[in-house]
């Protein structure tokens, strides 16, 4: 059974992660937010792809559900922390964290030499 303390502890070990308030939630982000923790510590919303969301919801319907608005259609997924094991929480956090990493700049302009 995972807890809010577990989420915070694991998230802050992921490279570049910071914690900041986000409305009534705690947000964990690198370049972008990848997970938010509810104020009551019972649930968290993870940044997943729609395909990852579908898989999580099919394999663990007691733990995962789409966020109930337009964000859910983009893959944002609510997890009930008490329904997750520690390793399941760690896998979900790492998956979401990877989606929030800065994108490489493929076409960076070089300075003009004069």
PLM regions and their residue ranges:
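Charge-dense, helix-prone N-terminal extensions
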Residues: 1-114
């Amino acid at each position: 059974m995972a807890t809010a303390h577990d989420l915070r502890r694991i998230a802050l070990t992921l490279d570049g992660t910071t914690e900041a308030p986000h409305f009534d939630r705690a947000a964990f982000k690198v370049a972008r937010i990848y997970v938010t923790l509810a104020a009551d510590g019972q649930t968290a919303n993870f940044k997943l792809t729609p395909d990852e969301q579908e898989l999580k919801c099919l394999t663990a319907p007691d733990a995962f559900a789409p966020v109930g608005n337009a964000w859910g259609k983009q893959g944002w997924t609510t997890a009930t922390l008490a329904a997750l094991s520690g390793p399941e929480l760690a896998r979900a956090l790492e998956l979401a964290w990877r989606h929030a990493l800065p994108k490489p700049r493929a076409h960076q302009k070089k300075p003009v030499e004069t």
